[in-house]
Amino acid sequence: MAQSNMPHKSDVLSQDELRKKLYQTFKDRGVLDTLQTQLRNQLIHELMHPVLSGEVKPPSISVEGSALLIGASNSLVADHLQRCGYEYSLSVFFPESGLAKEKIFTMQDLLQLIRINPSSSLYKSLISGFDKENKKGFLMSFLKELAEYYQAKESCDAETQTSTTFPSQVSLAEKFQLIDAQFADGFPHRSKLESLETKLNEYKKEVQHQLQVEMCHKLKYFREAEITKVKMEERRKYEKELAEFQNEFERTCQAKNEALISQEKNSLERIKKHREMESKEIYAQRQLLLNDIALLRGREAELKERIETFELTQKLQEEKIKSEAEALERREQNLKNIEDTYDQKLKTELLKYQLELKDDYITRTNKLLEEERKNKEKTIHLQEELTVINSKKEELSKSVKHMKEVELELESVKAQFLAISKQNHLLNEKVREMSDYSQLKEEKVELQAQNKLLKLQLEETRNENLRLLDRITQPPPELVIFQKELQKTEKAMELEHKDFETHRQALEKQLQSEIENSAQLRTQIAEYDASVKRLTVQVAELKSQLKQTQIALENEVYRNPKHSLIHSLSGLLLSGKMAPHSEDKSGDFLNVPLEQNKVIAGAVMSRVPPYVNTATEASSPESDFEFIASSTKAKVRELEQEAERLEKAFRTYYQRATQNPSTSPQPAKSPPSVNSVAALRSIASSSMDRPVSAEDRVVSEQPLGDMLKEEMSDMSKAFMGSVVSRPRRTSSSTRLSSTPHPKSRRSLDNEMYLEGLGRLHMTSSSPLLDRVSASPAASPSPCPERTAQASPVPSRHSFSGLPEQNACLYQRQTETQDKSELSNVDKQSLKDEKFEPPFRWNKTEQFEAEGLHPAGDMPGIDFAVATQSSRLISYDYPSAVQSQTGEQDEQELWELHMKERRQREEQRHNERQEALERERRELGKLEQERRMIEESLKMEMEEELEKSVQDQKDKSAHCENTLEKYMKIIQQRQEESNADKSSKKSGKECSLVDMMMPSDKDESSPGFSHEEPDDMW
């Protein structure tokens, strides 16, 4: 390119050689492309503005048409140059035409401009050819299509002088020729001295170059044509293969569909069979479920009442929890407001500090400029100041670290403040519950001390912040860094707060799950209570049936009395089988009351005939009445025979007792009396195999000395006052209780033997005592108040004989007892705790020594009273029985009915109290669980706070503050106090549970008390 400026030097190198050498050097150095672009730009500028050369520039070709057509033609040319690989001309064309690569028109746009119909064959062939042959440009394909179109139409019938060439205004070749001519005019003409050889060589090269270009174009055209043919053939082959593949695929799909349809039919049949089986099973299960539902509906009706009460308690607890949550939210809002005020204060202080720093920085910069202008000698001084500034920077970094530590301490103080606020809230609630003013004052003093310490620490932190702000002497960029660090710390605090909230939510979920578990437990307890109530109802029905049978039996026996039964009973006690040996007669038989009581119990129980299926037969009282009447009439003869022996034995026994009054045991002092009472108790309790009730335990575990003294004195006075006019009629009831077995039924088991003994004693003692005090001519009982005070509780039991000692005493006492029992029920449960341990110890020692076990089913005075009353009745006044009238029998029956009604009312009252106490226990358990959960939450919160404080301590190199130590001491004290309170509460609740467990067992005990008296007959 630059060889035209160089003079011809035949001595050194020719033009061609120099051109080749320059080309090679530029190419090796990698400067060829840049040099070509520079030369192109220069050429274009010189052609456009040939100012330096004095020649006139050729006139520019005016292009007619719109800008859109010009852009379309330019895009056609650019596309053609790009497709053909004419990079040089393309690089020249883009800047000359003002066209950008992004603004080139697409083929669809060009066809739309030319207004070729999209449905025409030309449009379709151009688009298909462009898609297939991306190497060719739009211009080449368009010209090819036009040539083929016009070649097909060259043969015409009429000869016309028309050319098939496409007319155009100016071709590209003409433009290039004009450019070459202008370029040639710009350069100086070659010298005429050039040889013809050089010209010929140049022409040859040009011709060869043109031939090569033409050959290349022809080869490209030939290749493209062959490639299109091959592509068409391959496309046809692929279409055939695709059609075959589609057919095969459709066949396989049809076969698969048929197989699937058959499988579906089989599966549907199986499913139908399975559904039929399931429907049958479901129907059977449905019937079972309907039966269960019918049972459960009955339970639901009972459970609704308990659920309502539970919902009321739950609502109260929810209201308490809501109030606590509102208080916590208010405190959180207060804390947020305090934090906002602190943040605003910090921001204002930082702004003030920034302004001060800016002012200081401006003044210092001015001073430094003045000092630099004045003297160059102060450079050394400035260097020293730089060292000082560096040291200050280090101090600043240290202060920043210290600030971070202080902020961490602030966070810990805030967390501690939150914990302290929660503790204050809990302490306030405890103070409301306990109303301990001394503890309140102490806690207030402690909290005030804590607040003072917190305020002091906050003031110290503020002072430290102010000191650090005074120390900082750095330009604003460092302040920006410091603000970023503050923002990071605030974000970290927010993340920690979020973690704390998530943990709190998890703990609340645990609380809800535990509450649900407690609700399930309550439902189970309610079901258990319902089953217990059903059993109690059944037991009450059985009791009523048994009482009816007893009343019928007594009425039948009263109609057919036998007068000599009381004498037969007294004679039987000292007859051949029951009397002690000669060894015992020599040494006072009454001094061994335990053995005496054992012998009496064995004698009486050997004659107790059992009746089978009393519980089942009690459902029909008329049939029972007929059966018992027939059996009693048949056995009266046997009773008359044994009555004579009993009378003889009783008379001899009473004579020996009156002859030896000094050796008779006193129940207040002598331990054998206690042993005799314990013997009968152990027999009755072991025979019935049931737990001892709490009220019986109260009676049996009172101090026996005072009780036995009072009752024996009262009974002796009552007997002495009523001896004169005592009726003889009372022997009928003793005959009822002491009717013997026939000989065929005397070989019974030990269990029936002992059960009959217990029932015999209670039924025989109560009518005797009733007859002792029921005579109308007898003087009024001298000490009814003392007897009522000595035994207020046993009147509520079916086994107690003291309330049935006399009718007049009972009528006077019941009015006072019914009033006092309602208030004494809670007191008696507390007396159990007082009297139980010492008396149990004494009983176990005595009974283990004699091989017996304690039982609280009978009061200890029954046996002594029964023996004394039977003694007095049978010995002194044997003729008073015949003067008894039928009216007194009816009155006694009415009194028995009244007693039974009162006992039922008392039992109902006891059951209600037991239900209330159970509910109290359940509430106590729920409160205990809630407190345990709150304590666990407190412990977890405290552990988290301690962990955070320990982490902060590990990060900071400082020692523990006095405030933290003080807080730890307070927390330890609170934990110890909480542990002590929880242990006390758990101990109280355990004692209450121990107290109330016998009351739960009492529900089953009355069932035995009224079911088994029929065994006497």
Swiss-Prot record:
One of its GO terms (cellular component) is nucleus. Phosphorylated. Phosphorylation at Ser-737, by the cAMP-dependent protein kinase PKA, triggers ubiquitination and proteasomal degradation of OFD1. Also increases its interaction with TBC1D31 and regulates its function in ciliogenesis. Ubiquitinated by PJA2, upon phosphorylation at Ser-737 by PKA, leads to the proteasomal degradation of OFD1. One of its GO terms (biological process) is negative regulation of fibroblast growth factor receptor signaling pathway involved in neural plate anterior/posterior pattern formation. InterPro entries: LisH, OFD1. Residues 897-988 have a biased composition (Basic and acidic residues). GO terms for molecular function: alpha-tubulin binding; gamma-tubulin binding; identical protein binding; molecular adaptor activity. Residues 69-101 form the LisH domain. Residues 609-666 are annotated as: Mediates homooligomerization. The modification Phosphoserine is found at residues 664, 670, 687, 722, 737, 747, 791, 823. Residues 657-676, 685-705, 721-749, 769-801, 897-1017 are annotated as: Disordered. It is found in: Cytoplasm, Cytoskeleton, Microtubule organizing center, Centrosome, Centriole; Cytoplasm, Cytoskeleton, Microtubule organizing center, Centrosome, Centriolar satellite; Cytoplasm, Cytoskeleton, Cilium basal body; Nucleus. Residues 722-740 have a biased composition (Low complexity). Keywords: Cell projection, Cilium, Cilium biogenesis/degradation, Coiled coil, Cytoplasm, Cytoskeleton, Nucleus, Phosphoprotein, Ubl conjugation. Residues 188-557, 626-659, 895-966 form a coiled coil. It holds the Pfam family LisH_2. The keyword NADP does not apply. Disruption phenotype: Females die at birth and display severe craniofacial and limb abnormalities associated with disorganization of the brain, reduction of the lungs, defects in the great vessels and cystic kidney. Primary cilia are absent on the luminal surface of glomerular and tubular cells of kidneys. Males die earlier during development of the embryo, display failure of left right axis specification associated with a lack of cilia in the embryonic node. Component of the centrioles controlling mother and daughter centrioles length. Recruits to the centriole IFT88 and centriole distal appendage-specific proteins including CEP164. Involved in the biogenesis of the cilium, a centriole-associated function. The cilium is a cell surface projection found in many vertebrate cells required to transduce signals important for development and tissue homeostasis. Plays an important role in development by regulating Wnt signaling and the specification of the left-right axis. Homooligomer. Interacts with LCA5. Interacts with RUVBL1; the interaction is direct and may mediate interaction with the NuA4 histone acetyltransferase complex. Interacts with SDCCAG8; the interaction is direct. Interacts with MAP1LC3B. Interacts with C2CD3; OFD1 may act as a negative regulator of C2CD3. Forms a complex with KIAA0753/OFIP and CEP20/FOR20; the interaction with CEP20 is detected only in the presence of KIAA0753. Interacts with PCM1; this interaction may be mediated by KIAA0753/OFIP. Interacts with TBC1D31; regulates OFD1 activity in cilium assembly. Belongs to the OFD1 family. This is Centriole and centriolar satellite protein OFD1. The gene is Ofd1.
